[in-house]
């Protein structure tokens, strides 16, 4: 929409990307939430049916766009794929293999160095993800037999006031509710937790990785901080390599990496990122 402009659907409803003060989010998000979740005195039926109508209008506008907009449309699509706001899947094996080679399939990768991927799911927490801020710091030291001793620090801040989310409310939107988060931390297979602070974790395996997982709640205007210490079987000799994979569909959280006394400048994780420290 930033390329094509405002979208108008049948019935005259208009959608834009301009920020709305009520949620500090694009107008299109606010209007879709209002359509789906605002209490009314009648049965709405298919409360998410507007999405199909909107997508049809968006596709019509894209296919009929002047040629001068095609480069911008293509660039926006590629950027969305790189940043995992769009993920592709094909039933045809050759097509699927092709998109996996360019990292457009959202796969958890095999990697010959250290690895980290944090994946989270909001369970009945309204639209808390619009407002929750997250910062990740990882400190790495060389352990016994050139393996790794690691500390992972994850901080959350939720600066917005809580909305009225009662099912009996007369009006208004429930956007800022209690953030109920299931977190899964993917690390190299064989990693083991040695200490935690602020969170209790279970340990399992999935997709060729060891996974630390837990469930927690964060209330509006609140903050949380977790510290997880663990060992990794990855060996280091001459250099330390780390692949951080971004979760699809989320904004780039801030990351800070320190390894063997060397620091990498903090950065937003907008896409998968490989970091290499020469030792």
Predicted segments with their positions:
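Lumenal/extracellular ectodomains and adaptor appendage modules
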Residues: 2-279
């Amino acid at each position: 929409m930033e390329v094509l402009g405002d979208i108008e659907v049948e019935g005259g409803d208009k959608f834009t990307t301009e920020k709305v003060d009520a949620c500090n989010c694009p107008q299109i998000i606010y209007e879709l939430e209002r359509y789906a979740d605002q209490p009314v005195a009648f049965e709405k039926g298919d409360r998410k049916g507007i999405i199909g109508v909107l997508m049809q209008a968006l596709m019509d506008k894209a296919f009929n766009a002047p040629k001068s907009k095609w480069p911008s449309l293509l660039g926006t699509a590629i950027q969305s794929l790189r940043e995992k706001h769009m993920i592709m899947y094909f039933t045809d094996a050759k097509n699927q293999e092709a998109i996996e080679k360019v990292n457009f399939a959202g796969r958890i990768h095999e990697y010959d160095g250290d690895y980290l991927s944090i994946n989270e799911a909001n369970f009945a927490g309204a639209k808390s993800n619009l407002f929750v801020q997250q910062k990740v710091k990882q400190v790495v030291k060389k352990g016994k037999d050139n393996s790794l001793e690691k500390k992972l620090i994850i901080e959350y801040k939720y600066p917005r006031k809580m909305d009225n989310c009662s099912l009996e409310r007369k009006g208004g939107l429930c956007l800022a509710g209690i953030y109920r988060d299931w977190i899964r931390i993917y690390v190299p297979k064989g990693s083991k937790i040695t200490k935690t602070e602020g969170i209790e974790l279970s340990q399992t395996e999935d997709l060729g990785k060891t996974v630390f997982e837990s469930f927690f709640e964060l209330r509006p205007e609140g903050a949380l901080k977790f510290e997880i210490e663990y060992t990794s079987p990855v060996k280091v000799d001459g250099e330390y390599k780390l692949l951080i994979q971004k979760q699809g569909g989320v904004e780039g959280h801030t990351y800070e990496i320190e390894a063997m006394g060397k620091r990498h400048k903090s950065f937003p994780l907008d896409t998968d990122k490989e970091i290499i420290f020469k030792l």
